[in-house]
Amino acid sequence: MVHTADNAWRAHIPLMYREDFLCSSGVARWNEEFPRHCVVSQHDRHKTKSVLVILFLIAMRNIKNNRGTFTRIKDRLSSALKSPASLFRRSPEISLREDILSWKKSPHSLAASEYGGSDLLVQFLKQQTSDDYVDFWLESGEYRWTRTKPGRKRDIEAQRIYDKFVYGECPRKIAHLEKMCFVSRQGPTGRDVFICAQAYVGTNFPKDSYKKFLQDPIYLNLLKTVSSGATQLNE
C-alpha cells in the first residue's frame, strides 16, 4: 500500500457496507488496511448490491470469452448505432420480447441475456456515474478473477490498469485510488492489488441502479418498441 504523511485523503473514504463487497475476503482486507473505517454490517447475511452482481457476471463472461470489456462493449454499441438489431442476437428458442421481459426477474437474468441487456445496463450505469468508474471496476475485476498463474503477462496487465486509472496524471485518473492499491517496489503485482480500490469505486454505483434501469427510458422505450413490433408481426 502506498502511504503518505498527508492523511487528508482519508476524509474522502466513504462509509463502507458489506453490500459493497462481493466476498468476505474483500471485507477482511479492507478492515485490515483501514481499521478506522471498518466495514459496517447492516444484516446478518452478506447481500451484495444487485448492480455489483451484474457487473461481476459480465466480467466473468468476458473472461470466458477471452475478450476485453471495453473493446467488446464498444464494438456492440458501435454496431447498434448503425443497426439496433445488431445488439439482439440469440437463438430462436426465446423471443426478443421474452428475453427483455426476463430482465425484470433478477440481476442474473439480465446478465445472462445475449440480446444486449448487460451492454445496456453498462451504458446506463456510465450515464449515472462515469465511464472511468465502470471501466475500472470491470477491468480490475477481470484481472482479479482470471485464473492464471503469476507471471510477466499478469504483471503487465496490472501495470496497464494502474497506468490507465491510477498513476500520476493519467488522463482517466480516479481520485484517491493511488492510496488504495497494493504496490510493491516491483510495481502493482498480485491478485489483490486492486481489491480495495475496486470496492471503493463500487460505492459510487447507487444501490438501486438495477431498479432504476428497469424504470428508465433506455429500457422502457426498448420494451415498447419490441412489443409494438411483435404486435405488428402478429396482425
Curated annotation (Swiss-Prot):
Q: Check the record and name the Pfam families matching this protein.
A: RGS
Return the PANTHER family for the record.
REGULATOR OF G PROTEIN SIGNALING, RGS DOMAIN-CONTAINING PROTEIN-RELATED
Keyword list (alphabetical) reads: Signal transduction inhibitor
Biological process GO annotation list?
Answer: negative regulation of signal transduction
Q: Which InterPro entries match?
A: RGS, RGS_sf, RGS_subdom1/3, RGS_subdomain_2
Q: Which organism is it from?
A: Caenorhabditis elegans
Gene3D superfamilies reported for this sequence: 1.10.196.10, Regulator of G-protein Signalling 4, domain 2
> Residue limits of the RGS domain?
107-223
Q: Which domain of life is it from?
A: Eukaryota
| Protein name per Swiss-Prot or TrEMBL | Regulator of G-protein signaling rgs-9
